[in-house]
UniProtKB/Swiss-Prot annotation:
Family membership: Belongs to the KdsB family.
InterPro entries: Cytidylyl_trans (IPR003329), KdsB (IPR004528), Nucleotide-diphossugar_trans (IPR029044)
Organism: Dechloromonas aromatica (strain RCB)
PANTHER family in the cross-refs: 3-DEOXY-MANNO-OCTULOSONATE CYTIDYLYLTRANSFERASE, 3-DEOXY-MANNO-OCTULOSONATE CYTIDYLYLTRANSFERASE, MITOCHONDRIAL
Protein name according to UniProt: 3-deoxy-manno-octulosonate cytidylyltransferase
């Protein structure tokens, strides 16, 4: 156990363009959202909640003794959904809340703990996670979100663009096929810790222009002057489920695990 009091909220939106009813995806006999909650329990969080906009998701969670509550269906982001949870639950302003994505059934409990600890230790408004990018294809992939950090470890900017840009290296004929030595390129992992007081404020913030164009909700906080502290981990965490191909891969993994029991 971590020794730090914090809560985990798992936003579980039912609708998904690429994977409808994603939270209910069967993984070895249990819905994916329940698998995520089981991993979160191992972090030692004092409360775990599934926040959903669909009665079937709530019923599935509660059938496996996972607390769930209904939230509005019109939230623009997962952070907006968490703000509603804070309001519904009446949590005190200094409560630490970790936002664990509902499509991460293999999330490492230690990373959840690290993120909560980083928020508590840094005094920042938000804590999140990143790891080094070692593959040029990932660096230039707009689906891989990059973060540039300041000297104090806070985020300076997040982008889908290749940042920072090694001008001289990439100007070479084959420069785009490799990354320079000691290149400070980091991939952002979508795990966040906040205080309830921040989430209450976030709900009233005007969306940022950069948030709209990059389609990155964390840019709203940066635009309004909030601090985001970044914990660097050595390697990429286990992959989540974003596509039908991911879903099939994850099903097979859990089926194999069940067969070995």
């Amino acid at each position: 156990m971590s020794g730090l009091a914090f809560k985990v909220v798992i936003p579980a939106r039912y609708a998904s363009t690429r994977l409808p009813a994603k939270p209910l995806l069967d993984l070895g006999g249990k819905p994916m959202v329940v698998r995520v909650a089981e991993r979160a329990r191992l972090s030692g969080a004092d409360e775990i909640w599934v926040a959903t906009d669909h009665l079937e998701v709530r019923a599935a969670a509660e059938a496996h003794e996972v607390a769930a509550l209904m939230t509005r269906s019109d939230h623009a982001t997962g952070t907006d959904r968490l703000a509603e949870v804070v309001e519904q639950r009446g949590w005190a302003g200094d409560t630490i809340i970790v936002n664990v994505q509902g499509d991460e059934p293999l999330i490492e409990p230690e990373v959840i703990i690290q993120t909560a600890r980083q928020l508590a230790a840094s005094g920042a408004d938000i804590a999140t996670v990143a790891h080094p990018i070692t593959d040029a294809a990932d660096f230039f992939n707009p689906n891989v979100v990059k973060v540039v950090c300041r000297a104090d470890g806070d985020a300076a900017y997040f982008s889908r663009a290749p940042i920072p840009y090694a001008r001289d290296h990439f100007a070479k004929e084959d420069g785009g096929e490799t990354l320079p030595a000691n290149f400070p390129a980091y991939r952002h992992v979508g795990l966040y810790a906040y205080r309830a007081s921040f989430l209450k404020a976030y709900a009233g913030l005007m969306p940022a222009p950069t948030e709209h164009f990059e389609s990155l909700e964390q840019l709203r906080a940066l635009w309004h002057g909030y601090r985001i502290s970044v914990t660097l981990i050595d390697a990429a965490p286990a992959p989540g489920v974003d596509t039908p191909e991911d879903a099939e891969r994850m099903r097979k993994l859990f089926d194999r695990a069940n067969n070995c029991e």
